Amino acid sequence: MATTVKPRGAEREEGATKGHLTILDHRTNKEYEVPIENGVISAMALREIKIDDDDFGLMSYDPAYKNTASTRSTITFIDGERGILQHRGYPIEQLAEKSRFLEVAYLIIFGELPTQQQLDEWVHGITHHTFLHENLKSLMESFRYDAHPMGMFVSSVAALSTFYPEARDVTDPATRLYQITRLIAKVPTIAAYSFRHSKGLPYVYPNNDLSYTGNFLSMMYKMSEAKYEPNRVLERALDVLFILHADHEQNCSTSTMRSIGSSQADPYSSLAGAAAALSGPLHGGANAAVLKMLNEIGDKKLV
């Protein structure tokens, strides 16, 4: 197991992140002290700054959450300028070298790397939920031949809520964990089916004898061969790519999912909303534009 490290900047003196902010309201000549905790002030503290008792109080205006945190999180630390990325305090270099994606997924969800027994149980639980209900498969087959894969993906993830109505009980920890397991297992299947549909290819059922990423490659690219053997270099590269993208702080899709989930909507509906946000050209859609450009180039000799 890796060794926990403090995020860059955690060694700063306590006085640099705690204390108070003094605000002088020139409208009333009143002075206010706003507590600072970990370099953050509460936006609700501004509500106390009023002209009189009937005043609503000050509000902060921050389009696009450019300087607003909606939650306290210990999942990911990023310092882009210094090239630092950590999940739960573990350097990304260490995780990419020594761990697999499902191990990192466990780390992100539970806060610690799993023991071998915990990892085996975790992988087994996910592996045996990779198949989709045949009715959901039929739903995906009903889309137009030229349907955009992201549109199919969003709709199919949302449809999962109709297959697992118990997911609405979001207050039960065991139920929540069950849906997490299902989503990690079924999202690659839905993604692969959406891709194959866009290519006019038949869907490939999951192969649970393969690794998480090996199975995904099989569902994406298996053709007429009796047994698909994933390219080991590509399989490992994809696993590392999944690790790098395992969490990206409070981005657009994360904020969308948290907003939907705050109403206690089921996890499938929440994730479908997040995926819809991801499809936008200013978010994950930018990756699609890059892939389109690479396909148009066609060969490295043309670069």
Identify the function of each model-found stretch.
Residues 3-303:
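Hydrophobic alpha-helical bundle cores within soluble ligand-binding/oligomerization subdomains
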